[in-house]
């Protein structure tokens, strides 16, 4: 009880002080700081190589160690390596792998791309990416959240082609499509959503794709269950209403070792 009395007395003193005539009212609290800039990324989508076994051997034994050795110089803060397993409808995957380097913002990304370390990593691609690749930069358009790790983490991703009307796409995407995804989240069972928008190809030309959306699941079994739900069907049925440029839908998993 003593602590309560002391607290009450202190409160009365504050009120009395604030009530004295002639004194200016307390200043308004400072405005909250602006939100941090969106995270930026470089992504490489590998096309199917001529020899997948040779690709994997070089990728893990030489290329990934090279990128890791240059990490501090390039300045990326996280890396995500994934492998596509199939298209969403069960056919052979349209692409083979995807690698993403994350940066704090676009300024840090542009600085990293200009380093000798990044040039060394880029020059190495021709040594194993025999099927070709698509390299793009962009920004995440939703809040970052923790990512499950480990080779069992599965995902479904949609790569949107450039739409006929970008403004109309964005309006419908934000106002209608994303709420449908959110409403079905519990039923679908994904653990994380990642939304990204491509700014350009790495060489400065127009981006090969417009946007990418990924839903992550704990494992392939959870993904299979989730993509079989009525809620996921509702998400899929909504795509033709705004993705008028076409899209590629794939399933895959994270990889951290050969």
List the predicted regions and their residue ranges:
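Bacterial N-terminal signal peptides that target proteins for export
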Residues: 1-7
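Macromolecular interaction modules
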Residues: 19-258
């Amino acid at each position: 009880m003593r602590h309560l009395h002391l607290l009450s007395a202190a409160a009365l003193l504050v009120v009395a002080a604030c009530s004295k005539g002639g004194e200016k009212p307390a200043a308004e609290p400072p405005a909250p700081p602006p939100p941090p800039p969106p995270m930026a990324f470089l992504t490489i989508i590998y096309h199917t190589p001529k020899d997948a076994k040779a690709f994997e051997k070089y990728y893990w034994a030489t290329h990934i160690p090279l990128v890791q050795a240059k990490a501090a110089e390039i300045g990326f803060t996280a890396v995500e390596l994934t492998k596509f397993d199939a298209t969403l409808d069960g056919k052979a995957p349209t692409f083979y792998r995807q690698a993403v380097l994350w940066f704090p913002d676009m300024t840090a990304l542009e600085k990293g791309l200009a380093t000798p370390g990044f040039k060394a990593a880029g020059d190495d691609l021709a040594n194993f990416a025999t099927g070709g690749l698509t390299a793009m930069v962009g920004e995440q358009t939703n809040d970052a959240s923790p990512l499950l790790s480990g080779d069992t983490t599965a995902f479904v991703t949609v790569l949107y082609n450039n739409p006929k009307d970008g403004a109309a796409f964005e309006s419908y995407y934000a106002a209608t499509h994303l709420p449908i995804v959110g409403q079905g989240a519990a039923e679908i069972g994904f653990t994380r959503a990642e939304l990204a928008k491509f700014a350009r190809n790495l060489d400065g030309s127009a981006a090969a794709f417009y946007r990418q959306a990924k839903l992550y699941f704990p494992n392939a079994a959870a993904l299979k269950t989730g993509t079989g739900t009525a809620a996921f069907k509702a998400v899929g049925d909504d795509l033709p209403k705004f993705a008028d440029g076409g899209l590629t839908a794939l399933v895959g998993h994270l990889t951290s070792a050969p």
